[in-house]
Amino acid sequence: MDEIIFRQYRLGDESRIVDLFIIGAPHKRTTGFWEWINKCGPFGQSIVEVGELDGKIVATYAVMPVQVQFKKELVKAGFGIQLFIHNEHRNINNTILIADRVYKRCKKEGFNFIYGFPNDYAFPLHSKVMGWEHIADFRCMELYTQKIKSDSEYDRDIKIERVEIFNEEIDNLWQQTSIADPAKNAVIRNSSFLNWKFFNNPLEHYIANVAKINGEVVGYMVLKLFRKENVFCGHLVDFLSRKQNEKLIFQSLLHRAFDFFGWAKVDVIFAWCFPSNTYFEMIYSIGFRPTGFNTHFALKPIKNNDLADLTKYDNWFITMADSDAF
C-alpha cells in the first residue's frame, strides 16, 4: 500500500476534504461551510494540513486563529477544529504526524496556545499522546421549559430589539463587561467576530437580540433552535451585558429568549455557563442545572509560557459560541 503524503492544504482540496467529513462524521458539512470557517474568520485564515492517498484526502487537521484576552492583553491563539482521519487510516502514528505538522506551523505563526473541545474518541489522544493539558470536563446547563421557576423580574425600561447585524456600537460593550474587568480568558467578542459567527454562517440560523438603555447597546443574547430526534431544543449560544445594571440587563434578555422559545414550543433550553461565570447564578436561580451532555475542555501549549492562569477552569469565559458545534 502507498504511504499517505502529508502536506499543507492547497486550493482545490476543499471538495475532497468535505468528502472525508461526509463519509465519517455525523454533522452536515459543505464546501461553503469549510471555506467560511477556515478562510473567512475574523482573525485570519486557518492553518490546515491534509493527508493524501491515491488522489483522495484521508486526513485533515485545521486550527483557526483567534484573539484571546489573557491578563488584559490580547494574545494570538488557535482553536483546534476538524481533526479527522479516515477509519482505515486512523491510528496514533498518523494522528501524531499530521498534528505535529500543524503545531510547527502554529509556532512559526506566533500562536501562544491552542484550545479545543475534543470528543470522547479524540480526548485520550489529545491528553496522553498529543501534549494537551486537560482544563476541565463540564456539563451543559439545561432547563426543561415546564420547570422554569420565574422570569418575571425584568426592567421594562430596557428595550430589547432583534438585529440582523451587529454594528460597531457593539465593539464598545466588551470593555464595559465583568468579563473584561477583572479580565477573564476569553475570545474577544467584537462586531467582526459576532457577525462572522452568527450572520455569515452558511449552515446555521441564529436569533440575535440586543438590549438598549436610552438608545445605547448594553447587552446581547444569541439564540438557536435545534431539533434532536423528537426533542425540540433552544440554545443560549452567546450572551454578554454591561457590568452596570448587569443583572437587570441579562434578565431582560432572558425574558425575551423565553418568550421566543415559548412561541417556538421548545422542550428544553441549553447553555454553556461555568460556575465562575458572572451569569451562572442568574440562570441557576431560574432552574438551569448542569445535567446535560459532558464536554472536554483542553489546551495545547505552543510557546513555553506560564500556563498557570490558562489551565485554571475558573479563569475562562466560555459559551457555546466558542465551539464550532453550535
Where are the regions a protein language model picked out?
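Active-site/acyl-donor-binding loops of N-acyltransferases
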Residues: 65, 112-156, 207, 213, ...
